[in-house]
Amino acid sequence: MRNNKGFTLIELLVVMIIIGLLAALVGPRFIRQEEKAKVKAAKAQIELLSTALDTFRLDVGRYPTSQEGLEALRTQPGGLERWDGPYLKKEVPTDPWGKPYVYKSPGEHGPFDILSYGADGTAGGDGDNRDITSWEK
């Protein structure tokens, strides 16, 4: 009798099929969790930017204009004597999808609007592609 110490081709195929099935079941759930984490990160960054904008307003007496943008939280706009920044420790963040946040002041929903266009980078959308905004908590 021969003493074979290896796996047969059938055994290897069965293991590969099981691994493939597990990956097919777990993979989409992992991707959804990653997108949920990005949405939560965008909401947290918008909250951080909102707090910095409120501090800017307390010092200067107004929010940065749309032209000055969020960069006014890092570098002093011309003609502002009471600017006491920088109001962010690091550079103005991009959204979790690598795109800049949209800032409007005055805003349509409050004194300012901050939004990310989500995963697809375009206005509107549903699910992972929906916009993340400062006015929707």
Language model features with spans:
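Phosphate-coordinating loops and pocket residues in cytosolic domains that bind phosphorylated ligands
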Residues: 27, 32, 68, 75
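Short, compositionally biased strand/turn segments
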Residues: 6, 71-72, 76
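N-terminal single-pass transmembrane signal-anchor helix
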Residues: 2-30
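A structural feature recognizing the 12-helix transmembrane core of secondary solute carriers
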Residues: 7, 29, 33-36, 43, ...
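Short, intrinsically disordered low-complexity segments
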Residues: 1, 28-31, 39, 56
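Short, surface-exposed interaction loops/tails
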Residues: 36-40, 47, 51-54, 60, ...
